[in-house]
């Protein structure tokens, strides 16, 4: 087997499957996007759910990825085992309704055993399968040539998480040899057992059944492949080391810990635990912060804080009693940089966050350990259990993690009264929930906000930055003097460049900072007394009231918002010009990436009207009109023709945004200085949102250009596929193809009729007399449901005085049609005939007395239904 670096294994895996026609799906951020069901991305397939559940169609049905992931369900095991991790990489190849077991197994075997790829010795590989999966067994045994003795049947080889896709799986194991254990079934020394000799290196899941609500299983219409190979584990096998922690993914970190601690790795088992905890946790923390997570007291932020504090606690067993974890970030960045440059790019920020957390926790730890040692003495002298209220006080007052209290208690031979602790925690949650309800996300006029009357001046019309003072901090519905890192806080500034959400325009985002702390601003709203109320998360440090700070708006977003807001005014004026003065704004949303405008109008706009509006807006952009903004009294504004928005309330002094002569409108938002800054305007959709209200969504500037570029790319592809040279030929070619298709379909229908007629022979000979009626009841072989109706038309023209009932099986679905001559409909009704027949084939139907149709899902009962209907007519 080749000895490969982890980065080489990753690249070989991706290259191999690209050669097999797979599309590389880039590793997604650890913080899930648009998936509230996950705290973290926890597997290779987690980011592909949109493809497997059909929400999106991938560009290719074959996908390969190397996905970073976090799992924290067994944190306490990390450090004590050879392969437990909170952060890991999962290599995976996936098929969305394309290849299945045969190719999946063949691909796996080739990648593992080929000298071009991993070069593993075939005689060291074993596999497990589900006992009933004979298809997988035959592929492994007959096609791959694996001896029967190396194929182990295990009942647990079935991937099933409840309702939804499920199926058997096959796992591939590598035999590391007798140095890791002698064969002994009693000790689970076999592939699939708990041992260190036979390591699972790859899991192939064959998703072929749907687990139904009634716990039955039915075959999936599209079978999928989902595989997973842990990079850390494969690296340990390739590099022939005992544990994942001895691979090149971890050893540079271990070497740095050795330098800082003066201790050696792989000398003392107890020390090794600390080495492994630190090395694992710093990878998780660095990557999570680089992907947008921050230490906090709840959610994923609490996971980070817990991991960091656990690592700091174990670092003390190595004699490290000062912040040092942040120094490992550069090591992690260097190891992972080839595939994950994000950590190196954000290394300075990551280090600042970690160092700030470490400093806080060292203070907490010193105070907390002194108190905990007293509690341990007390418990040993009495019940051998640390009181739950004491543990909660340690957690609540001193920030000492309960997990750490438990861990230290166990080391001292004690337990913690967790029942009482949880009771105290629940009471705290109830208090916090009540506080949240009272404050309603600070958007209601709480007593705290109503009592704040100090001024906060908005200066953002003229600047995106300001040197200012932080005057008020609100945390958990109460005004406070300081707030710690990781917490969500509301605050006010004496002067602020941040625009508060208003008039459909979203709030600015950005940062407020000084040398001691930084707040990432995510929302800005108006407080009851008119001040701009900022919401943000403390990135690092301790925030104090009275601090002098720099306030910086995200200028890229600000510029895009300005473009979209000014374009919204032009759009409003253009709609009035094209559609009429009845158009009034019914709502709007101005964001950085798009604009949305709701307006009153009677019905859908025509394509020509949309084109006219778009052209008008762009012409005003290309004219380069100066945008003049003035404050004046409402009377003067109306006199100059300023448009006031329907339903809006205005004060005595108003702000007029003037793009004369095309648009003059009252507005408090932020705008470009000249319409040419907008660059380009493109309407991307027009739709209805309710009675008399239409909605336009549009893009400006670069976003509009990229949208048009994408359309042009698709058009060029279509032109290439149509094999035409000029743009003008595309429509003519499409028209030609449509005409040809119609002609071919007509020919095909005629051919189908002729084939059906030949198969049926002389239909007059098949007519029976039943109960005095001429009746033709038969199954016909037709290519589609439409063909059964044309066959019926053909038969009717030949058998005008006959009751005709036809049934067909097309793609395991039953179609049936019945006709009754109008002269007979007083006695026999076609609708009744179909209603009687359809349930027999698991369906329903009906229609007029002279013509009816139906369908069903049980083609095996067609003959039964035809016999039944003959008896039914006989008994009329």
Swiss-Prot record:
It comes from the Bacteria. Keywords: Aminoacyl-tRNA synthetase, ATP-binding, Cytoplasm, Ligase, Metal-binding, Nucleotide-binding, Protein biosynthesis, RNA-binding, tRNA-binding, Zinc. InterPro entries: aa-tRNA-synth_II/BPL/LPL, Ala-tRNA-lgiase_IIc, Ala-tRNA-ligase_IIc_anticod-bd, Ala-tRNA-synth_IIc_core, Ala-tRNA-synth_IIc_N, Ala-tRNA_ligase, Ala_tRNA_ligase_euk/bac, DHHA1_dom. It is found in: Cytoplasm. Disulfide bonds: none annotated. Zn(2+) binds at residues 565, 569, 667, 671. It catalyses: tRNA(Ala) + L-alanine + ATP = L-alanyl-tRNA(Ala) + AMP + diphosphate. GO terms for biological process: alanyl-tRNA aminoacylation. GO terms for molecular function: alanine-tRNA ligase activity; aminoacyl-tRNA deacylase activity; ATP binding; catalytic activity, acting on a protein; transferase activity; tRNA binding; zinc ion binding. One of its GO terms (cellular component) is cytosol. Pfam families: DHHA1, tRNA-synt_2c, tRNA_SAD. The keyword Transmembrane helix does not apply. Its EC number is 6.1.1.7. Binds 1 zinc ion per subunit. Its main location: cytoplasm. Its cofactor is Zn(2+). NCBIfam families: alaS (TIGR00344). Consists of three domains; the N-terminal catalytic domain, the editing domain and the C-terminal C-Ala domain. The editing domain removes incorrectly charged amino acids, while the C-Ala domain, along with tRNA(Ala), serves as a bridge to cooperatively bring together the editing and aminoacylation centers thus stimulating deacylation of misacylated tRNAs. Catalyzes the attachment of alanine to tRNA(Ala) in a two-step reaction: alanine is first activated by ATP to form Ala-AMP and then transferred to the acceptor end of tRNA(Ala). Also edits incorrectly charged Ser-tRNA(Ala) and Gly-tRNA(Ala) via its editing domain. Belongs to the class-II aminoacyl-tRNA synthetase family. This is Alanine--tRNA ligase. It comes from Staphylococcus aureus (strain MSSA476). The gene is alaS.
């Amino acid at each position: 087997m080749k000895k490969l670096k982890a980065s080489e294994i990753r690249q070989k895996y991706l290259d191999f499957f690209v050669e097999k026609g797979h599309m590389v799906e880039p590793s997604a951020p650890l913080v899930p996007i648009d998936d509230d069901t996950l705290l973290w991305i926890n597997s290779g397939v987690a980011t592909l759910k949109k493809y497997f559940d059909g929400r999106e169609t991938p560009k290719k049905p074959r996908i390969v990825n190397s996905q970073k992931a976090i799992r924290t369900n067994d944190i306490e095991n990390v450090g004590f085992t050879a392969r437990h991790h909170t952060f890991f990489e999962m290599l995976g190849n996936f098929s969305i309704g394309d290849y299945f077991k045969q190719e999946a197994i063949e691909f796996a075997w080739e990648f593992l055993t080929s000298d071009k790829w991993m070069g593993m010795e075939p005689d060291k590989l074993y596999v497990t399968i589900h006992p009933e999966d004979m298809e997988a067994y035959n592929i492994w045994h007959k096609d791959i040539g694996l001896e029967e003795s190396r194929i182990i049947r295990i009942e647990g080889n079935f991937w099933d998480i409840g309702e939804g896709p499920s199926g058997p799986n096959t796992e591939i194991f590598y035999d590391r040899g007798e140095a890791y254990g002698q064969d002994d079934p009693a000790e689970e020394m076999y592939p699939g057992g708990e041992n260190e000799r036979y390591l699972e290196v790859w899991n192939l899941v064959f998703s072929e059944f749907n687990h139904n609500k009634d716990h039955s299983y039915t075959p999936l219409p599209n079978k999928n492949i989902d595989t997973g190979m842990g990079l850390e584990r494969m690296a340990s096998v390739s590099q022939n080391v005992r544990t994942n922690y001895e691979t090149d993914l971890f050893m540079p970190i271990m070497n740095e810990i050795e330098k800082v601690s003066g201790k050696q790795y792989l000398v003392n088992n107890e020390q090794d635990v600390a080495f492994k905890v630190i090395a694992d946790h710093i990878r998780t923390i660095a990557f999570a912060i680089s992907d947008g997570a921050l230490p906090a007291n709840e959610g994923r932020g609490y996971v980070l804080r817990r991991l960091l504090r656990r690592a700091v606690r174990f670092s003390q067993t190595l004699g490290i009693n000062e912040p040092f974890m942040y120094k490992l970030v550069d090591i992690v960045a260097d190891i992972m940089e080839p595939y994950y440059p994000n950590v190196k790019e954000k290394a300075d920020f990551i280090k600042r966050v970690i160092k700030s957390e470490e400093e806080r926790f060292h203070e907490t730890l010193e105070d907390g350990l002194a108190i905990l040692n007293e509690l341990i003495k007390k418990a040993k002298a009495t019940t051998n259990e640390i009181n739950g209220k004491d543990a909660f006080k340690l957690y609540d007052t001193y920030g000492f993690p309960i997990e750490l209290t438990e861990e230290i208690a166990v080391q001292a031979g004690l337990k913690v009264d967790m029942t009482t602790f949880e009771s105290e925690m629940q009471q705290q949650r109830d208090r916090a929930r009540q506080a949240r309800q009272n404050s309603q996300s600070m958007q209601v006029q709480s007593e705290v906000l109503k009592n704040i009357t100090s001024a906060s001046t908005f200066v953002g019309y003229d600047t995106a930055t300001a040197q200012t003072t932080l005057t008020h901090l609100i945390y958990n519905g109460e005004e406070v003097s300081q707030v710690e890192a990781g917490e969500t806080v509301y605050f006010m500034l004496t002067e602020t460049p941040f625009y508060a959400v208003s008039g459909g325009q979203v709030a600015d985002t950005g940062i407020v900072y000084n040398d001691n702390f930084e707040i990432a601003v995510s929302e800005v709203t108006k407080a009851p007394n008119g001040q701009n109320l900022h919401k943000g998360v403390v990135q690092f440090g301790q925030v104090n009231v009275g601090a002098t700070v720099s306030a910086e708006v995200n200028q890229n977003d600000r510029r895009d918002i300005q473009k979209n807001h000014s374009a919204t005014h032009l759009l409003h004026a253009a709609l009035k010009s094209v559609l009429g003065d009845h158009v009034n704004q019914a709502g709007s949303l101005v964001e950085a990436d798009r604009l949305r405008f709701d307006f009153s109008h009677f019905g859908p706009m025509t394509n020509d009207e949309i084109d006219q509006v778009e052209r008008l807006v762009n012409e005003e952009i290309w004219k380069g009109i100066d945008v003049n903004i003035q404050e004046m009294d409402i009377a003067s504004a109306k006199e100059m023709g300023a448009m006031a928005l329907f339903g809006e309330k205005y004060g005595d002094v108003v702000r007029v945004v003037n793009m004369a002569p095309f648009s003059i409108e009252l507005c408090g938002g932020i705008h470009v200085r000249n319409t040419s800054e907008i660059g380009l305007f493109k309407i991307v959709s027009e739709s209805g949102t309710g009675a008399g209200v239409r909605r336009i969504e549009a893009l400006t500037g670069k976003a509009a250009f990229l949208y048009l570029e994408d359309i042009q790319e698709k058009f060029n592809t279509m032109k290439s596929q149509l094999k035409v040279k000029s743009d003008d030929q595309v429509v003519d070619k499409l028209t030609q193809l449509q005409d040809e298709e119609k002609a071919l379909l007509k020919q095909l229908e005629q051919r189908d009729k002729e084939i059906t007629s030949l198969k049926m022979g002389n239909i007059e000979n098949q007519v029976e007399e039943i109960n005095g009626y001429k009746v033709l009841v038969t199954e016909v072989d037709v290519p589609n449901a439409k063909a059964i109706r044309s066959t019926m038309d053909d038969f009717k023209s030949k058998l005008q005085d006959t009751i005709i009932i036809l049934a067909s099986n097309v793609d395991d679905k039953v179609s049936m049609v019945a006709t009754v001559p109008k002269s007979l409909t007083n006695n026999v009704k076609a609708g009744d005939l179909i209603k009687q027949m359809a349930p027999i084939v698991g369906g329903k139907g009906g229609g007029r007395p002279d013509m009816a149709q139906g369908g069903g899902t049980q083609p095996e009962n067609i003959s039964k239904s035809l016999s039944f209907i003959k008896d039914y007519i006989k008994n009329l």
